Amino acid sequence: MKDWERVLGLDLAGSPKRKTGYAFLKDKRLVVGTLYTDEEILEISKGFKLIMIDAPLSLPEGRRSIEERGPHFRECDRLLKKSGYRFFPISLGPMRMLTERGMRLASILRSKGLEVLETFPGAMYDLLGIDRRDKNAILSLYKSLPFELEDRPYSQDELDAVACWLAGVCYLMGKVLTFSGKDGKIVVATGECFSSPPLDKE
C-alpha cells in the first residue's frame, strides 16, 4: 500500500481558469482538492512516481498538431468506442484545449522521470454500473474502500480525480483494462480490482 502513496490522480481542466481535481493517499487517508494553474499542478506532482491524468495525452497518428486538420480518433479511442464507452473526440471544441494542455504537462512530467498515463473515469463508472454524474453513487463506492475520506460535499472534478487515482492503484495491482494503440494508451480500472485485496474492504 505504500506504493499507492506515490500515485497522483488528476482530473485535468482544459483551461487554468477552471478547476483541476487532484487526489492522492497519505497515511491511509485520501487527500482530495482542486487547483488551477500549470505551476500548481507541477508543484503538487513533486514526490510522486505515477501520474494518472483524465485527458488525451497524444494525437492521432498522421495529425501533426491539434490546430491542423487530421484524423479525429486515435487507435486507442477506436478500441474504447468499440467496447461501448462514450467519449468526446479530441477535435471537439473544448477537447482541443484539454488535449493540448494534457500533452504539454505530460511531456514536462515525463522529462522529470515520472510515469504518466492517460485514464478515463467515465469508462470506470460504466464498468461498475454507476451513472457518470451520480455523485452519491460514486461517493458511496469510495466510502466502501479501506481509506479514510473526509465527510463533505465533493465536486465532480474531485470525484473524477479519485477515479484517476484508483486507476493508478489498479494499474499497480495489474487489474486494469488497457486500450493500447500505436498512437496512445488508455488505462481503466476494472471491477475485479475492487473485489480484490486490499481494496475489498471487509
Predicted regions and their residues:
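Phosphate- and other anionic-substrate recognition elements at nucleic-acid/protein interfaces
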Residues: M1-E202
